[in-house]
């Protein structure tokens, strides 16, 4: 199977690519249009650029905002870690108390079962 067959079987984009490859003048024209479009976009972007002092001021504001975001992110991580650590420590405190309660119930249950099982005959 040739490259054209593989591209044509790949779908719509593959069929268009195969057609462009078979028609070299059309491919050349398409690439030339892309080149003109990119040149126009670069010229248009150059007209939209701000003067140097305004760009510097905007850059400083962006950097300052990014620094504030980093500080807030670090504070959130600190709070998150404290909450997780507090949750783990409270779970560890409650867990032995549950065991202690179970032991207390176990110690009561045998005496109750002894009392109920020993019925007068």
From Swiss-Prot:
Keywords tagged on the record: Fertilization, Membrane, Signal, Transmembrane, Transmembrane helix
Membrane is among the record's keywords: yes
Membrane topology listed for this record: Single-pass membrane protein
Keyword Signal: yes
GO biological process: single fertilization
Parts of the chain that traverse the membrane: 18-36
Localization terms from the record: Membrane
Signal peptide coordinates: 1-17
GO CC annotation terms, alphabetical: membrane
Tissue specificity annotation: Testis-specific.
InterPro entries attached to this UniProt entry: TEX46-like
PANTHER family: TESTIS-EXPRESSED PROTEIN 46
Function: Essential for male fertility, sperm head formation and sperm penetration through the egg zona pellucida.
Protein's name in the database: Testis-expressed protein 46
Lineage: Eukaryota, Metazoa, Chordata, Craniata, Vertebrata
Gene giving rise to this polypeptide: TEX46
């Amino acid at each position: 199977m040739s490259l054209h067959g593989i591209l044509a079987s790949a779908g719509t984009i593959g069929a268009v690519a195969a057609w462009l490859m078979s028609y070299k003048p059309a491919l050349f024209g398409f690439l030339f249009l892309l080149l003109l479009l990119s040149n126009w976009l670069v010229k248009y972007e150059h007209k939209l650029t701000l003067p140097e002092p305004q760009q510097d001021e905007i850059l400083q504001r962006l950097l300052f905002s990014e620094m504030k975001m980093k500080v807030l992110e670090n504070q959130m991580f600190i709070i998150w870690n404290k909450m997780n650590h507090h949750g783990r420590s409270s779970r560890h405190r409650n867990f032995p108390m549950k065991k202690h309660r179970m032991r207390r119930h176990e110690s009561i249950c045998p005496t109750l079962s002894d009392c109920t099982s020993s019925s007068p005959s």
